[in-house]
């Protein structure tokens, strides 16, 4: 960001975009009470990047389907079992890395993440739900293709999400 700014670029943090208008020589970006004018845009909107791209007049072939990863922390007396990162052998048929063990800088050890569909783009808890986000997910054909291909894995991931015993057993 510093290099970008040093060359004349502007960075607007914490500025939710409500509307983007394409002009002949650039864009008008509306955010709250402010309007920004730009010749070019750099989209760093994370989980909202596909929505911003569509607002800018692009038609991306992809959509972001939000997944949430959950971690469990080892009991302190079990932390000595893991001295370094441990990754599973990847399954080339799966789009996810798999649950791994990570020794943190404070000596604790975490196991995770799993991968479960988030019911909201920024849904980090099971209780985070957005009906508009769900409607967008379910309206996207790519979601149904993914679901048809990995439905068994999806069910297993949810079982492990709702049962710590099943999560631990799968390690």
What are these regions (language model features)?
Residues 3, 51, 55, 170:
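Alpha-helical scaffold segments in soluble metabolic enzymes
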Residues 59-61, 77-79, 104-106, 114-171:
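Flavin-binding catalytic cores
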Residues 5-17:
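A conserved beta-strand/loop element that lines the FAD pocket in flavoprotein oxidoreductases
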Residues 1, 6-7, 25-26:
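Rossmann-like NAD(P)H-binding beta-loop-alpha module
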Residues 20-129:
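Flavin-dependent oxidoreductases
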Residues 7, 36-38, 157:
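Flexible, glycine/proline-enriched loop segments at strand-loop-helix junctions
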Residues 15, 30-33, 151-152:
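Short amphipathic alpha-helical segments at helix-loop
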